[in-house]
UniProtKB/Swiss-Prot annotation:
Role summary: Exocellobiohydrolases (CBH) that catalyzes the hydrolysis of 1,4-beta-D-glucosidic bonds in cellulose to release the disaccharide cellobiose. The degradation of cellulose involves an interplay between different cellulolytic enzymes. Hydrolysis starts with endoglucanases (EGs), which cut internal beta-1,4-glucosidic bonds in cellulose to reduce the polymerization degree of the substrate and create new chain ends for exocellobiohydrolases (CBHs). The CBHs release the disaccharide cellobiose from the non-reducing end of the cellulose polymer chain.
Organism listed in the record: Hypocrea jecorina
EC number: 3.2.1.91
GO cellular component: extracellular region
Keywords: Carbohydrate metabolism, Cellulose degradation, Disulfide bond, Glycoprotein, Glycosidase, Hydrolase, Polysaccharide degradation, Pyrrolidone carboxylic acid, Secreted, Signal
Propeptide segment residues: 19-24
Reactions it catalyzes: Hydrolysis of (1->4)-beta-D-glucosidic linkages in cellulose and cellotetraose, releasing cellobiose from the non-reducing ends of the chains
Name used for this protein in its record: Exoglucanase 2
Top EC class, one word: hydrolase
Length: 471
């Protein structure tokens, strides 16, 4: 369901060469698909756009050429190759290495007490900023272009959704270290999102690892790689959201064979992640779905029991601060009038949700859990959703409350933007390998590119409907 930043968009290798004018008539339009595995459509782009690799399943026609100055920055931070250091980010550990010795922590740790969002400024995701500057702004003018530039400066999380994305984490932390040495006090924000058989109840964001093909061991190597980076940059506070959708699927979707098969692997992998990343400079939040998913009365206690068990089975790690809600979703924080699509559930916003599940966590042995809530796409209420469970590229949405630790709520550590607005949730093309029917519903904006690809029309929608406004 949830899509992170699955791939680089704007400035990786250009795939399409110049096409004669007579052939342009059959080329894809700007923002259309122009390549990818099993793609049988046009592999060229209309005049004024260039075919750019996005992922193995998708290449996209982007405006202009990939050699602009704004694209150069993106290229320097989105390489698909491993970093040229002694660290290995591709080797798979032997099957027997299911538990590894916890290596020592680096010196100069950015420790904290209490709310980890207090006393630091979350870092604005440079990759997302490069997308906005190179993909969104060139086709905007006037006030919209100025507003888009302001969006690029809002702190948002970077998604580590493949092993190949870990060099981006390293580069980001290096940039933060430089900024902090020059007088800043920044913290890094990342999403750990690479479970084997990921997204078990949907199709749009299937990941790179399979349980049947050594996925658990590969995932542990992915976590080891992240840990090495975090230890190397132990002078920087690092804020992590752990595996969106995974545990929530274990609450409600075990009737789906893929989820039932993945249950033990999910729990083993998440235990490994929160144990290995239990570092003095780290604060972690397990993804906890949202009010319209686990906030229903029948789901609240089973969810709380599962989250508390994960916490206790990992020996109550200090760095596991609590839960993240509404990641990549659309619910308002404290709206007072329930939208029609929430009918039947008294827990119709995220504030009600965290105050419902917080005491239940304590009942099950996790008494000091706190929360963050994603408001990146929650600015317009009600949304255009026809059903509360409609999650893909929903119409009638806008950028929401800006990230801030000034929440006015004892359980909420911070408002955050976890989902970078403008990156697609999933394709509306029913012939695509990762097509999910939710992305072709009447309340999904269409036509939509592959998950993770830039969706200009959606970015414009979010910007137009933003509350507070950027205009």
């Amino acid at each position: 369901m949830i899509v992170g930043i699955l791939t680089t968009l704007a400035t990786l290798a250009t795939l399409a060469a110049s096409v004669p004018l007579e052939e342009r008539q059959a080329c894809s339009s700007v923002w259309g698909q122009c390549g990818g595995q099993n793609w049988s459509g046009p592999t060229c782009c209309a005049s004024g756009s260039t075919c750019v690799y996005s992922n193995d399943y998708y290449s996209q026609c982007l405006p202009g050429a990939a050699s602009s100055s704004s694209s150069t920055r993106a290229a320097s931070t989105t390489s698909r190759v491993s970093p040229t250091t002694s660290r290995s980010s591709s080797a798979t550990p032997p099957p027997g290495s299911t538990t590894t010795r916890v290596p020592p922590v680096g010196s100069g740790t950015a420790t904290y007490s209490g709310n980890p969002f207090v006393g630091v400024t979350p870092w604005a995701n440079a990759y997302y900023a490069s997308e906005v500057s190179s993909l969104a702004i060139p086709s905007l003018t006037g006030a919209m272009a100025t507003a888009a530039a302001a969006v690029a400066k809002v702190p948002s999380f970077m998604w580590l959704d493949t092993l190949d994305k870990t060099p981006l984490m390293e580069q980001t932390l290096a940039d933060i270290r430089t900024a902090n040495k020059n007088g800043g006090n920044y913290a890094g924000q990342f999403v750990v999102y690479d479970l084997p058989d990921r997204d078990c109840a949907a199709l749009a964001s299937n990941g790179e690892y399979s349980i049947a093909d050594g996925g658990v061991a590969k995932y542990k190597n992915y976590i080891d790689t992240i840990r090495q980076i975090v230890v190397e940059y132990s002078d920087i506070r690092t804020l992590l959201v752990i595996e969106p959708d995974s545990l929530a699927n274990l609450v409600t979707n075990l009737g789906t064979p893929k989820c039932a098969n993945a249950q033990s692997a999910y729990l083993e992998c998440i235990n490994y992640a929160v144990t290995q990343l239990n570092l003095p400079n780290v604060a972690m939040y397990l993804d906890a779905g949202h009010a319209g998913w686990l906030g229903w009365p029948a789901n609240q206690d089973p969810a709380a029991q599962l989250f508390a068990n994960v916490y206790k089975n990992a020996s109550s790690p200090r760095a596991l601060r609590g839960l993240a809600t509404n990641v990549a979703n659309y619910n308002g924080w404290n709206i007072t009038s329930p939208p029609s699509y929430t009918q039947g559930n008294a827990v119709y916003n995220e504030k009600l949700y965290i105050h419902a599940i917080g005491p239940l966590l304590a009942n099950h042995g996790w008494s000091n859990a706190f929360f963050i809530t994603d408001q990146g796409r929650s600015g317009k209420q009600p949304t255009g959703q026809q059903q509360w469970g409609d999650w893909c590229n929903v119409i009638g949405t806008g950028f929401g409350i800006r990230p801030s630790a000034n929440t006015g709520d004892s359980l909420l550590d911070s408002f955050v933007w976890v989902k970078p607005g403008g990156e697609c949730d999933g394709t509306s093309d029913s012939s695509a390998p990762r097509f999910d029917s939710h992305c072709a519903l009447p309340d999904a904006l269409q036509p939509a590119p592959q998950a993770g690809a830039w969706f200009q029309a959606y970015f414009v929608q979010l910007l137009t409907n933003a509350n507070p406004s950027f205009l």
